[in-house]
Regions:
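Hydrophobic beta-strand positions in extracellular immunoglobulin-like domains
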Residues: 5-7
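An extended, acidic, His-containing surface patch that forms the Zn2+-binding/catalytic region
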Residues: 30-126
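Active-site pocket-shaping loop/turn-to-helix segments
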Residues: 11
């Protein structure tokens, strides 16, 4: 049997694994771990995240906010990396579907946000 799980940021992979093994042992079930990744979390209070939120707010005029995801994103192994974009409130969520698309207006707004974020993060926005 294959068991896939994501670990909360408040516990290490080793801690969860030892608890699972202890819970399964009385039932004669062995747990073999093939792959494990430590949880990835970047605080909303980090300077990096604050700059990204500032750019979003400056470009859109809307209040930015952070969302914690349980999924494994492309930034999981990037220290202090965060996923940023690309959907806006009210957009149809069609990411990763067979007919994936983005509205032209959203694509252009994302490009403007990303360009400004790069400038801000590089200190070139003055």
């Amino acid at each position: 049997m294959l068991f896939r799980s994501r670990f909360p940021v408040c516990e290490s992979c080793a801690g969860i694994t030892s608890k699972l093994k202890a819970a399964l042992e009385p039932y004669g079930i062995a747990l073999n771990v093939d792959l494990q990744c430590e949880p990835h979390h970047v605080s909303a209070d980090s300077g990096f995240v604050k700059k990204l939120l500032e750019v979003y707010e400056d470009v859109t005029g809307e209040k930015g906010y952070t969302v914690a995801l349980g999924g494994l994103t492309y930034v999981h192994d990037t220290e202090n990396g965060v996923a940023f974009g690309a959907e806006f409130p009210g957009d149809e969520n069609n990411m990763h579907n067979a007919d994936e698309f983005i509205r032209t207006e959203s694509l252009l707004l994302n490009a403007k946000i990303y360009a400004n974020a790069i400038l801000r993060l590089c200190g070139k926005d003055e």
